[in-house]
């Protein structure tokens, strides 16, 4: 079994129960899914770039991503409707916990000048979104085999009703936050 899943079931649930005194065990917040999005603006000029982004995201997430398409044409960016402009993957259950474990333990310590996340990244409904500027912080990515450094957006969707509950939940998973709530 995964360490983060065991950590949630054995410790975090109890801590949340004590802190917020839930009456129903189903009201205790949990992480529902993790969405990783990689926008590839260069794909407008070179369609092969999207394949490299898909390969990188497959290595990082362990799951094949979906290619995202442009919803409407924008002449300024030379963008046409239904052009491939990125890829995303939604992780749930065991793959989600596996990714979060690799993110917190391996990837985040490798980010340059990283001091922690800001509480401003919460959306007011308990979801947490942040961006990484380089995909090479993940050990699955070989620096010599990538064509260019790309960033990604990561959204952690929780069942928490407030940002405070969500912050407490993510702090239980050792997410580094740098300012007070």
Swiss-Prot record:
Keywords: Ribonucleoprotein, Ribosomal protein, RNA-binding, rRNA-binding, tRNA-binding
A GO biological process held by the record: translation
NCBIfam families from the UniProt entry: PRK00010.1 (NF000585)
GO CC entries: ribonucleoprotein complex; ribosome
One Pfam family it belongs to: Ribosomal_L5
Organism classification: Bacteria, Pseudomonadati, Pseudomonadota, Alphaproteobacteria, Rickettsiales
Cysteines paired by S-S bonds: none
Function (record text): This is one of the proteins that bind and probably mediate the attachment of the 5S RNA into the large ribosomal subunit, where it forms part of the central protuberance. In the 70S ribosome it contacts protein S13 of the 30S subunit (bridge B1b), connecting the 2 subunits; this bridge is implicated in subunit movement. Contacts the P site tRNA; the 5S rRNA and some of its associated proteins might help stabilize positioning of ribosome-bound tRNAs.
Official protein name in the record: Large ribosomal subunit protein uL5
Entries under HAMAP family matching the protein: Ribosomal_uL5_B (MF_01333_B)
Gene it is expressed from: rplE
Biological source species: Rickettsia canadensis (strain McKiel)
InterPro entries (UniProt xref): Ribosomal_uL5, Ribosomal_uL5_bac-type, Ribosomal_uL5_C, Ribosomal_uL5_CS, Ribosomal_uL5_dom_sf, Ribosomal_uL5_N
Subunit field text: Part of the 50S ribosomal subunit; part of the 5S rRNA/L5/L18/L25 subcomplex. Contacts the 5S rRNA and the P site tRNA. Forms a bridge to the 30S subunit in the 70S ribosome.
GO molecular function: rRNA binding; structural constituent of ribosome; tRNA binding
Protein family: Belongs to the universal ribosomal protein uL5 family.
